[in-house]
Swiss-Prot record:
GO terms for cellular component: cytoplasm. The gene is tilS. Coiled coil: none annotated. This is tRNA(Ile)-lysidine synthase. It is an enzyme of class 6 (ligase). PANTHER family: TRNA(ILE)-LYSIDINE SYNTHASE-RELATED (PTHR43033:SF1). InterPro entries: Lysidine-tRNA-synth_C, Rossmann-like_a/b/a_fold, TilS/TtcA_N, tRNA_Ile_lys_synt, tRNA_Ile_lys_synt_N, tRNA_Ile_lys_synt_subst-bd. Keywords: ATP-binding, Cytoplasm, Ligase, Nucleotide-binding, tRNA processing.
């Protein structure tokens, strides 16, 4: 009880007149928290229990719910419950069961907070949980706020989440239950080695407690220091990213990569994390600091243009000083690129739209190639060739036609989607003459009667594993 009072005083929290939702599983931690808050507040606050049956353990799960309901009835407490098919939710969302259970719980808690216009959601995470969480994050390579573990107080729903037990241990909670004659339910799955947290709890935590009995307090101090440092760095990062971000929508963010890479590394990492937090509804559990560093290395050293795949369908499209983070299917807004075909050897240019252009010397031309193949020679056009995006005023001298035609009009005639036009490849020779619009139109500079010994065959085709970088 003293620990709860100390927690409330430290964080300047007043429970008098408040509505407090308590997440109650029926286990010793949540039963102790419900009892402590009810005893502390009496009738000066409205304490409400909220229980979720995840339906993982059949009849046992339902018995947990009945146990919580019976306790609340005896204590004259309101009890809100929900039975959720978490397994089905996990399959639908592509999540593991633990992540799915957490999603379902917090969605339910938010609904109950809204229903009662609650001020607080009290959760029974304790000091041992905090140590486990921070170690698991560290082992995964998490940086920034995530490494600080669970926050003692944070905004949520109509109010705030509070975790009054973060400075006490599981052993102290069990002692409180025994001292106050509290019954509780036991979840046998907490003893299984199937879950990462359980393995940390059974192997790592006992060693740390043996070395330092107050390890939970030390970790909590580290957590608070990391949080304070992170808040300062986040503030700096937001100021700098306002200069780095050039445009954004609900599904995409475009940045100037040169300006990002000019920032100190701690701000670079946090800048990318801010973008991810903005774009992802929930950052995938598979995401780690490795992905952020991978992006930064690629942005600096990966060539002028390309595409990087992130989890859950997020792509980063790079073109010179621009990087576009997007969930859109190639609806890339004005992402220019430019590659060269020297003509000296067989070459391949891989394009950001998922296609490539191959240049092959002395090759036989396909029997039916249409506009996806262009045949020429160094006698017919001047090398090097350039593959680029369109420019204002572009015109092409079409095969079988007098004069020239605007590239813009060709795109309109072909009903090319507006979002694809700025990224459609155009091939020019060394003088800047447009010789080919791959897949759409050819110029007068194609020659089908060139001998094999002189011919260069250009082919435009789809490439599934696009990474958008020219190579020879």
């Amino acid at each position: 009880m003293k620990s709860v009072k100390d927690f409330l005083n430290k964080h300047n929290l007043t429970l008098k007149g408040a509505t407090i939702i308590v997440g109650v599983s029926g286990g010793p931690d949540s039963m102790a928290l419900l009892h402590a808050l009810h005893t502390l507040c009496g009738r000066s606050a409205n304490v409400i229990a909220a229980h979720v049956d995840h339906r993982f353990r059949g009849a046992e799960s339902e018995e947990d719910m009945r146990f919580v309901q019976a306790y609340c009835k005896a204590e004259q407490l309101v009890c809100e419950t929900a039975q959720i098919n978490v397994t089905a939710y996990a399959q639908e969302k592509g999540l593991n069961k633990q992540a799915a259970a957490r999603d379902c719980r917090y969605q339910f808690f938010e609904e109950i907070m809204s229903k009662h216009q609650a001020d607080y959601l009290a959760l029974a995470h304790h000091g041992d949980d905090q140590v486990e969480t921070m170690l698991m994050k560290l082992a995964k390579g998490t940086l920034g706020t995530g490494l600080a573990g669970m926050q003692p107080v944070r905004r949520f729903g109509t109010g705030r989440i509070i975790r009054p037990f973060l400075t006490i241990t599981k052993e102290e909670i069990l002692h409180y239950c025994h001292e106050n004659g509290l019954s509780y339910r036991t979840d046998e799955s907490n003893a299984k080695d199937d879950y990462t947290r359980n393995r940390f709890r059974k192997t790592v935590l006992p060693f740390l407690k043996q070395e330092s009995p107050d390890v939970h307090k030390r970790f909590q101090k580290v957590s608070e220091a990391l949080t304070e440092d992170e808040q300062f760095l986040q503030s700096l990062t937001k100021d700098e990213m306002n200069k780095v971000i050039t445009s954004q929508s609900n599904t995409s963010v475009e940045i100037n990569s040169s300006q990002l890479l000019a920032l100190p590394m701690p701000l670079q990492r946090r800048g990318v994390q801010l973008i991810l937090n903005y774009l992802y509804e929930n950052v995938p559990s598979s995401f780690s600091a490795h992905h952020i560093q991978q992006f930064l290395d690629w942005a600096e050293n990966g060539g002028p243009s390309g595409v990087l795949d992130f989890p859950k369908g997020l792509k980063v499209v790079k073109s010179y000083q621009t990087c576009l983070f997007t969930f859109e299917q190639w609806q890339c807004k004005n992402v220019p690129f430019e590659y060269q075909i020297s003509g000296a050897a067989d070459e391949t240019a891989v394009l950001p739209n998922g296609y490539l252009i191959e240049a092959r010397h002395y090759a036989d031309s396909p029997e039916e190639h249409g506009n996806a193949v262009f045949i020429t020679s160094e006698k017919k056009v001047r090398f090097p060739l350039t593959i680029r995006t369109r420019k204002a005023g572009d015109r092409i001298k079409l095969k079988g036609m007098n004069g020239s035609k605007k590239v813009k009009d060709i795109f309109i005639d072909k009903k090319l989607p507006l979002q694809e036009r700025d990224n459609w490849p155009i091939v020019t020779d060394a003088s800047g003459e447009i010789i080919w619009i791959p897949g759409l139109k050819k110029s007068i500079f194609e020659d089908l009667v060139i001998p094999n010994s002189d011919r260069i065959v250009l082919q435009y085709r789809q490439h599934e594993k696009c990474r958008g970088q020219a190579k020879s």
